[in-house]
Design a protein with these regions (language model features):
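Transmembrane alpha-helices and adjacent helix-loop boundaries
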Residues: 1-255
Length: 255
């Protein structure tokens, strides 16, 4: 039999669902870290100081120009070649340095921060110059303009793109399975090797990721609607009157 639904439901899905917390932890922790790293990178990429600006842009180009898998392998397999072996074995950080989960977190965070910074940089550039000039005209400092005008407007502009990046980040966590992290994809690969069945583990993993993406998209859409709620205004009363007069029923003879 090529595909067995009972095997999928009884054997595969319970193990895949048990690995969902690991996938969510990879996504949430690296997503939060990428935002914390991306904000200063975006500000530095648009700074007036030329060395700071070009060094930030060069870093963004380097991270965006290299595959995530290469970055992950450099961290996981190359970090141990740099630091002394005694330090990795005897230091307080040795439990973390031996856990592939944290290497995946660092690689995902650094990689995603470059894309977050690029999105935020474009959103900051999209803030109308008139609003910034108005803030300065009211006597605001550069920090106040950034905090009260540029920041809120840029986040509103960047929210749809950041939602898309969050979905891509969730799907990028499958690469953590290549360094022995047992997330959903790592568990699916283990089941494939142990049972010699291909379709059930992969189909089950696909179903889990589709559900996770849906659970991520729905609250993101509600958040975007909530943030932009003030942009939805009721039609002007005069426009409603014109529409009513232009309708065919308005010219019909009374009974």
């Amino acid at each position: 039999m090529i595909f067995s639904l009972p095997f999928l439901l009884d054997t595969v899905m319970p193990k895949l669902l048990a690995a969902v917390p690991t996938t969510l932890a990879l996504t949430l922790v690296s997503g939060a870290a990428s935002v914390l790293l991306g904000v200063p990178l975006a500000l530095a990429a648009g700074a007036r100081h030329a060395p700071l600006r070009w060094s930030s842009r060069g870093w963004l180009m380097l991270i965006r120009g290299t595959p995530l898998l290469v970055q992950l392998y450099l961290l996981y397999y190359g970090f141990g070649q740099i630091v002394p072996r005694e330090w990795m074995r005897d230091s307080w950080a040795s439990p973390l340095l031996r856990d592939a989960f944290w290497y995946a977190i660092v690689a995902l965070s650094v990689n995603e921060s470059a894309y977050v910074a690029t999105i935020l940089r474009g959103a900051i550039a999209g803030v109308p110059a008139g609003e910034i000039e108005a803030g300065h005209a009211y006597g605001m400092t550069r920090v106040q303009v950034l905090r009260r005008i540029v920041g809120p407007r840029a986040w509103r502009l960047a929210l749809p793109a950041l939602t898309g990046e969050a979905i891509l980040l969730l799907k990028s966590t499958v690469l953590a399975s290549t360094v022995t992290v047992f997330d959903v994809m790592g568990t699916a690969n283990t089941l494939r090797f142990e049972t010699l069945r291909v379709y059930e583990p992969l189909v089950g993993a696909a179903v889990v990721y589709v559900v996770l993406v849906a659970l991520l998209t729905i609250p993101a859409a509600r958040l975007e609607k909530h943030v932009n709620r003030h942009l939805t205004r009721a039609p002007d009363a005069r426009v409603a009157v014109r529409r009513r007069r232009a309708s065919p029923d308005a010219w019909s003879a009374p009974n």
